[in-house]
Design a protein with these regions (language model features):
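Hydrophobic helical h-region of N-terminal Sec-dependent signal peptides
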Residues: 9-15
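Phosphate-group recognition and catalysis centered on beta-loop-alpha active-site segments
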Residues: 9, 22-216
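Bacterial N-terminal signal peptides that target proteins for export
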Residues: 1-8
């Protein structure tokens, strides 16, 4: 837990509806990072189903784009850690990725599938992290395409009283998303402790939420 991020507080302060009352009382809201990642393969549908069934209402996931422009749920640049496949996500087509199984035999999922799962679930907080590194995999036009597709896919089925955020450590992605959708909820991920510098950096980008280290 040494690299524990200040996202629990962000989650509590940002929730809407019934959870907003909890936030006003400064109650910390627990959430599932990549789903139930220790009990199930991370970022798979069983992982998210299990954590939701366990009563969690806050979640985080990661989005990358395949070579042919499909949005797949994957934290790592390659599939090597979770599957027998060693390839880079951005070099694969959606068809190729759909043929890959995790080491536990689960399917890799695409963003529309995850959005569909949460479409009928009220008062949920989700961080859809934009994974757009390495930078060379997402030049400006591809980055624009990515941001537009992510936003449209996620927001198309968002329940009215849920809160969906778009975090990233890539400032290019945050700026592009802000340019395309000025009212979007963003979160800046920084590997440094919270300090005046990080706060001012977020304010300068028009971002109200930080994901940063507590220690330091």
């Amino acid at each position: 837990m040494k690299n524990f991020f200040l996202k629990l507080g962000v989650c509590a302060l940002a929730l809407t509806g019934a959870a907003e009352a909890l936030a006003q009382e400064q109650v910390i809201q627990l959430f599932a990072h990549r789903g139930s990642r220790f009990e199930y393969d991370e970022n798979t549908l069983p992982a998210f189903k299990a954590s939701y069934d366990a009563g969690l209402r806050g979640f985080e996931t990661d989005i990358r784009m395949t070579r042919d422009g499909e949005l797949v749920i994957s934290h790592d640049e390659t599939l090597a850690r979770l599957t027998p496949c060693k390839r880079v996500v951005e070099t694969m087509t959606a068809y190729e990725i759909r043929k890959v199984k995790t080491n536990q035999g689960n399917d890799l999922i695409f963003l529309p599938e995850l959005v569909d799962f949460f479409a009928d679930k009220d008062n949920v907080y989700i961080e859809f992290e934009m994974k757009t590194k390495p930078v060379e995999s997402y030049p400006e036009e591809r980055l624009r395409e990515y941001c537009e597709k992510v936003y449209n896919t996620v927001m198309a089925k968002k329940p009215a009283n849920s809160l969906y955020l778009f975090p990233s450590s890539d400032k290019r992605a945050l700026k592009m998303m802000r340019l395309l959708h000025p009212d979007v909820d963003l979160l800046l991920i920084i590997s440094k402790p919270i300090c005046e510098e990080t706060i001012l950096e977020a304010i300068d980008m028009g971002i109200k939420r930080l994901g940063c280290r507590i220690e330091g």
